C-alpha cells in the first residue's frame, strides 16, 4: 500500500472517524474504522504529539425517519437509543473520544447554517427546478430511501441517492429509472420542484490539484477520488423534502442533504471539545493544524470530493489526510446483515465474555489496513493462541512471575546494549508503520520484540542461574523486566486495557496511557516493588469457538429461511460476492434456476472438476447405531455409525434442529469418511454425514432408497 506522509510532526493533529449511523447496532464492520483510528491517536500521543480525537453519531437522513415511523417513535427517540449504544460500546472497547456528539446537536445545526450560508453568499449554491420522485397514493415527495428503482448507470436496484447494490455511484434526484415508493410499494412519478445545488463542477481543477499534491492518507482513497474527478463532476443537489434534519437557510420546507451536515459534524464536535477543554477549534478548521479522517472505503467519494470542495468554498481548512479501510468479510462471505453474515459487537462478542483487546488485536494484525479483512472465529482463535498467548503473554508472565517469586522487586542491573538495540529497532519500525497507517506492520514489529524476549529468557536459563549466581541472574531478570516495560508501552495503543495490567504488575504507579514511547529506554529503578502477576491472556478453547460458530450458522440459517419464506427463495450468497465487478459478473453467469411446483431456489453451479478430484472423496453408506445430543449445544448430535470398519465412526452433525435421535437410529446414511477430523464443542468428529439444505428452512439427511450393506462406496 502506498501512503503519503504527514508534512509536519509539530502541528496539533485532529483525528476523526466516519460517523456511526444512529439507526442500528455496532457490528464488526464499524470497528474496521474506529479501532485503527484509536490506535493511531494513541500512538501519536505516545510520540508526544498534541492530539484531539472526535466523533459522533450521524442522526439525519431518510433511513432514520423510515425506521422511526415503523417503530412508532420519533427520530429523536430512535437517535437517543443508538447514540447511547455506540457511546457505551466504544468505551467498552477502550475507544475514548475527546468529544462524541450528534449531528442533531445545536453546535452542528449552527455550524451547518454558517457554512451553507457562506456558500450561498459566495455564489456556490443556486436554485434549480428538477424532477423529484412523487407518490400519488401517499401524496408526498420521495427523497432518498423513500424511493427505489433501477440505477441509470448499471441497471441494478438502487436507492434514490445511491446505487448501493450495484456500481456504488451517487445518484441525484430524478436519475432513478422506474421509481417505486418504498412506503406503499406503488409506482412513483416525477414532478417538478425547486431545489438547491452546490456548484461542485467549479471545483474540478482545485480538487485534482488537491488530490494530486496536498491530500495525504491511503492512496486507495486518493486514486479512487481522482478517477471520479477525471470523469467530470456535476453539480450536487444539497436539499431534501424532509422535516427531520438541519433546515436549509430561508426554507422551512427543506433540509440540507445528510451528506452536507454529517461531515460538518467533525467541526461541531471539535467545537464541543474546545468548549469543554478551553481550547481552540479554529487551530484545526481555520488554521494549519492537521486533520486526519479515518473512514470506511465506501464513503471515499464524500470525504475526498464533496467535503473538501465545501470546505474550500466556505473558507475553512481542508483535510490533511483521508485513511480508507478495506471491506470486511465474515467467514469468507460478503458482509451482509440481511443474509446473516454479520458479527454484532455486543451480543456476539462482548456479551459472551470475550476481552475487547483480543478483537482490537485481530483487527490491527490480520492484514494491511486497505486490504479486505476476513473475520473468522477459527482464525481469531489461532492468532490469539499462537501470538498473544504463546509469544507476548508467555514472555510477560514468565518474566514477571520469576522476578516476583525470586526477588519481589526489580533487582540491581543495567540495560545491556543488545536489549537497548532491539528496543530502539522496534520503536523505529513501529513509529514508521503507524505514520504509514500500516497497523499490521507495527504489530508484527512489536511481536518480534516479544519473540526476542522469549529467546533471551530461554537462552539465559535464569531458573538454573539463580542457583549458581543470584547477582548474575538478577542482571538477566532486570533486562527481561526492562523488555517487559518496553513491550507494555509499545503494545498499549493496540491492547490498552491488558497493557495497563502489565504496567501495574511491573510496579508502575503512573498512567501508562499518558506515558511516552521514549520511556521504553529509561532504565528501571532497582528496588521497585513488583505486584503478584496475573495471566494476561488465556487460550481460546475449541468448545468456546465451536459455540460461536454454531450461533453464526444458526443466524445464517434463520436469515435464509426468512428470505425463502418472504421472497420465494434467493440463493445463499457465494464466495464470488466478495469478488471485484468483473469476477462477480462472470460468477453470476454460472447461476441457474431450479424450479419446482411449490418453490424456486437458486443454485450456484460450481466449476467443473476432473474425475480424479471426485475419486479422492471416500463416500460410503453407513448404518446409524447411536445418536445423542452434544452437551452445551442445542444444534449438534453425536452419532456413531457403522461404515464397514472394525469399530463404529463417531460423527458430530448439526442435525438436532431437524431430527430426533430416534428418527436417525437404524437408518442408512451417506458419510464422507476421509474428511480431516475436527472438534465441535469438544467432541471429535471423524467424518461428515451428508445432507441437503434448501437454504435453512429444510435440512434432509441423504439416505439410500434401497437396503444396501454398510461400507458400500458411492461412485
UniProtKB/Swiss-Prot annotation:
Key words, A-Z: Aminoacyl-tRNA synthetase, ATP-binding, Cytoplasm, Ligase, Metal-binding, Nucleotide-binding, Protein biosynthesis, RNA-binding, tRNA-binding, Zinc
Molecular function GO terms recorded: ATP binding; metal ion binding; methionine-tRNA ligase activity; tRNA binding
Motif ('KMSKS' region) on chain: 334-338
Domain of life: Archaea
Residues the record lists as binding Zn(2+): 151, 154, 163, 167
Subunit and partners: Homodimer.
Any one GO cellular component localisation term in the record: aminoacyl-tRNA synthetase multienzyme complex
Catalytic reaction annotation: tRNA(Met) + L-methionine + ATP = L-methionyl-tRNA(Met) + AMP + diphosphate
Cofactor requirements of the protein: Zn(2+)
Cofactor, how bound (note): Binds 1 zinc ion per subunit.
Intervals of motif 'HIGH' region: 20-30
Function: Is required not only for elongation of protein synthesis but also for the initiation of all mRNA translation through initiator tRNA(fMet) aminoacylation.
Location(s), subcellular: Cytoplasm
Region (Disordered): 559-593
GO biological process: methionyl-tRNA aminoacylation
UniProt-listed NCBIfam families: metG, metG_C_term, PRK00133.1
Binding site residues for ATP: 337
Similarity field: Belongs to the class-I aminoacyl-tRNA synthetase family. MetG type 1 subfamily.
Top-tier EC class: ligase
Residues in tRNA-binding domain copies: 613-715
Organism whose genome encodes this protein: Methanosarcina mazei (strain ATCC BAA-159 / DSM 3647 / Goe1 / Go1 / JCM 11833 / OCM 88) (Methanosarcina frisia)
Name of the featured protein: Methionine--tRNA ligase
A Pfam match: tRNA_bind
Amino acid at each position: 500500500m502506498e501512503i503519503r506522509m504527514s508534512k509536519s510532526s509539530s502541528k496539533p493533529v485532529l483525528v476523526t472517524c466516519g460517523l456511526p449511523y444512529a439507526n442500528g447496532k455496532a457490528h464488526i464492520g464499524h470497528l474496521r474504522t474506529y479501532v485503527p483510528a484509536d490506535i493511531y491517536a494513541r500512538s501519536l500521543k505516545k510520540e508526544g504529539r498534541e492530539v484531539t480525537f472526535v466523533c459522533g453519531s450521524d442522526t439525519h437522513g431518510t433511513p432514520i425517519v423510515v425506521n422511526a415511523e415503523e417503530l412508532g417513535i420519533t427520530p429523536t427517540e430512535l437517535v437517543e437509543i443508538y447514540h447511547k449504544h455506540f457511546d457505551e460500546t466504544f468505551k467498552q472497547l477502550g475507544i475514548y473520544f475527546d468529544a462524541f456528539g450528534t449531528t442533531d446537536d445545536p453546535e452542528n445545526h449552527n455550524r451547518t447554517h454558517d457554512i451553507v450560508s457562506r456558500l450561498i453568499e459566495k455564489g456556490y449554491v443556486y436554485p434549480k427546478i428538477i424532477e423529484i420522485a412523487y407518490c400519488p397514493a401517499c401524496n408526498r415527495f420521495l427523497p432518498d430511501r423513500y424511493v427505489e428503482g433501477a440505477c441509470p448507470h448499471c441497471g441494478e436496484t438502487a436507492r434514490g441517492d445511491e446505487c448501493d447494490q450495484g456500481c456504488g455511484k451517487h445518484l441525484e434526484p430524478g436519475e432513478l429509472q422506474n421509481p417505486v415508493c418504498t412506503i406503499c410499494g406503488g409506482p412513483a412519478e416525477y414532478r417538478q420542484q425547486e431545489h438547491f445545488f452546490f456548484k461542485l463542477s467549479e471545483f474540478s481543477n482545485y480538487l485534482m490539484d488537491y488530490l494530486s499534491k496536498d491530500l495525504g492518507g491511503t492512496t486507495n482513497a486518493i486514486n479512487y477520488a481522482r478517477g471520479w474527478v477525471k470523469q467530470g463532476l456535476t453539480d450536487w443537489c444539497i436539499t431534501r423534502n424532509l422535516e427531520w434534519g438541519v433546515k436549509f437557510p430561508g426554507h422551512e420546507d427543506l433540509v440540507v442533504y445528510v451528506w452536507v451536515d454529517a461531515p460538518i459534524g467533525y467541526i461541531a464536535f471539535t467545537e464541543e471539545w474546545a468548549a469543554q477543554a478551553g481550547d481552540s477549534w479554529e487551530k484545526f478548521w481555520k488554521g494549519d493544524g492537521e486533520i486526519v479522517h479515518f473512514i470506511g472505503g465506501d464513503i471515499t467519494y464524500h470525504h475526498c470530493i464533496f467535503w473538501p470542495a465545501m470546505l474550500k468554498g466556505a473558507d475553512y481548512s481542508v483535510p490533511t489526510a483521508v485513511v480508507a479501510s478495506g471491506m470486511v468479510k465474515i467467514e469468507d462471505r460478503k458482509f451482509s446483515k440481511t443474509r446473516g453474515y454479520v458479527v454484532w459487537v455486543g451480543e456476539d462478542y462482548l456479551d459472551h465474555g470475550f476481552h475487547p483487546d483480543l478483537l482490537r488485536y485481530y483487527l490491527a494484525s490480520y492484514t494491511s489496513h486497505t486490504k479486505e479483512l476476513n473475520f473468522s472465529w477459527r482464525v481469531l482463535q489461532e492468532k490469539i493462541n499462537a501470538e498473544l498467548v504463546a509469544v507476548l503473554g508467555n514472555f510477560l508472565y514468565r518474566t514477571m512471575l520469576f522476578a516476583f517469586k525470586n526477588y519481589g522487586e526489580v533487582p540491581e542491573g543495567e540495560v545491556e546494549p543488545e536489549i537497548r538495540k532491539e528496543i530502539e529497532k522496534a520503536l523505529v519500525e513501529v513509529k514508521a508503520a503507524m505514520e504509514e497507517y500500516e497497523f499490521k506492520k507495527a504489530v508484527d514489529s512489536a511481536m518480534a520484540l516479544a519473540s526476542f524476549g522469549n529467546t533471551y529468557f530461554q537462552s539465559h536459563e535464569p531458573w538454573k542461574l539463580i542457583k549458581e549466581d543470584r547477582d548474575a541472574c538478577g542482571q538477566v531478570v532486570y533486562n527481561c523486566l526492562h523488555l517487559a516495560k518496553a513491550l507494555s508501552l509499545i503494545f498499549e495503543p493496540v491492547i490498552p486495557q491488558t497493557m495497563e495490567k502489565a504496567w501495574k504488575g511491573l510496579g508502575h504507579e503512573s498512567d501508562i496511557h499518558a506515558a511516552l514511547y521514549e520511556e521504553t529506554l529509561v532504565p528501571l529503578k532497582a528496588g521497585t516493588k513488583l505486584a503478584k502477576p496475573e495471566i494476561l491472556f488465556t487460550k481460546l478453547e475449541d468448545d468456546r469457538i465451536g459455540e460461536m460458530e454454531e450461533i453464526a450458522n444458526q443466524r445464517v440459517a434463520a436469515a435464509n429461511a426468512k428470505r425463502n419464506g418472504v421472497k420465494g427463495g434467493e440463493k445463499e450468497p457465494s464466495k464470488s460476492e466478495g469478488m471485484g465487478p468483473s469476477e462477480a459478473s462472470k460468477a453470476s453467469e454460472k447461476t441457474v434456476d431450479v424450479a419446482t411446483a411449490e418453490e424456486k431456489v437458486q443454485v450456484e453451479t460450481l466449476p467443473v472438476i476432473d474425475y480424479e478430484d471426485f475419486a479422492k472423496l471416500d463416500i460410503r453408506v453407513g448404518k446409524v447405531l447411536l445418536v445423542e445430543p452434544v452437551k452445551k449445544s442445542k444444534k449438534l448430535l453425536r452419532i456413531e455409525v457403522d461404515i464397514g470398519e472394525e469399530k463404529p465412526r463417531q460423527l458430530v452433525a448439526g442435525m438436532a434442529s431437524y431430527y430426533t435421535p430416534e428418527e436417525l437410529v437404524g437408518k442408512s446414511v451417506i458419510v464422507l469418511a476421509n474428511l480431516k477430523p475436527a472438534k465441535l464443542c469438544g467432541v471429535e468428529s471423524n467424518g461428515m454425514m451428508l445432507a441437503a439444505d434448501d437454504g435453512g428452512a429444510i435440512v434432509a439427511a441423504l439416505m439410500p432408497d434401497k437396503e444396501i450393506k454398510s461400507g458400500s462406496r458411492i461412485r
